[in-house]
Amino acid sequence: MTFPSLSVSFLFFAFIFVTHAFDLSIIQMQQGTCPYTVVVMTSCLSPESTRDQISIVFGDADGNKVYAPKLGGLVRGPGGLGKCSTNTFQVRGQCLNDPICSLYINRNGPDGWVPESIEIYSEGSKSVKFDFSKSVPQLNTWYGHNNCNTTGRPSSPDLPPPHFPPEFPPETPTTPPPPPPRPSAASRLGNGESVFLAFAIATAIAAMVRWSY
């Protein structure tokens, strides 16, 4: 007798769940977030490994941009953005119009990381590849390509250079403190030895005094 009521309850909760999921998808579409795949090829002129922090920003001709900070920090273990390596990153950001026509790099670190190319993949669009001709980005400045407007001078992104706390050790180790001075002979004696030595000296002095009389 309770099966029909259970079926009605199940259908009701299923309807609520589907409606909620549909509302979430609508909210995500309204927010305009899209997934992107970023493939970074590091030049063979780059160091074997790097502590540099690499950020990128790419955009379309309408001025929409996607900012992906600290790509190097997403790679764990050896080989991350190292010499001759290829690393893939999943980035989510504002939905861009086709085609993606600008990409800039920001490098912050001591190692001089050298990019070979960066390729951007987006859903339903052809990938776009930006070659960097093995040139090193200047330290903590935006460097890259803007193919969105071929009639005007390419402009750098209107973003300040990212400021990250350094996660790399200093290039040269700090000078170690000088060793402590060596203890004197008296300081090396324990309390018992000091008392015995004082008693022996006092006894010798007393004997010398008696012999003098």
From Swiss-Prot:
Expressed in seeds. Expression is restricted to the developing embryo. GO terms for biological process: embryo development ending in seed dormancy. Residues 1-21 form the signal peptide. Residues 157-183 have a biased composition (Pro residues). It comes from the Eukaryota. The keyword Glycoprotein applies. Glycans are attached at residue 149. Pfam families: ATS3. It is found in: Secreted. May play a role during embryo development. This is Embryo-specific protein ATS3. It comes from Arabidopsis thaliana.
